[in-house]
């Protein structure tokens, strides 16, 4: 299943033990034209901060962000970039000095929207 694939990828890419992940929901599937990937994002929970081991070929680094920081409007920014010789505004998150953009930013934007509407 897609959920099992998400758990497997989490284990393979950042080393989180499959047995400690509890899936609590899923987000909207999305297509990424640049990579031709279809992504089915899931939200997982662990009782404690999990041990991670980064797969260097897949992930640059792992860092933690509080839910409170994620939902702050000031952490969602835009910058100008060029795509196919056109200037475009690219949204990104600035989280504890880390820039999160692209597909990860799109997924986090939906998660942030859900969290803000739970209050």
Language-model region placement:
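Unchanged
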Residues: 1-100, 109, 113-119
């Amino acid at each position: 299943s897609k959920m099992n694939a998400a758990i497997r990828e989490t284990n393979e890419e950042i080393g989180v033990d499959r047995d400690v992940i509890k899936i609590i929901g899923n987000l909207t599937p999305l297509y990424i034209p640049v990579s031709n990937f279809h992504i089915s994002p899931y939200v997982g929970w662990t009782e404690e901060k999990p041990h991670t081991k980064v797969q260097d070929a897949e992930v640059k680094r792992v860092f933690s962000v509080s839910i409170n920081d994620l939902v702050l409007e000031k952490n969602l920014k835009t910058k100008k970039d060029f795509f196919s010789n056109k200037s475009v505004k690219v949204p990104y998150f600035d989280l504890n000095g880390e820039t999160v953009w692209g597909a990860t930013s799109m997924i986090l934007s939906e998660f942030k929207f859900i969290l803000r509407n739970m209050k």
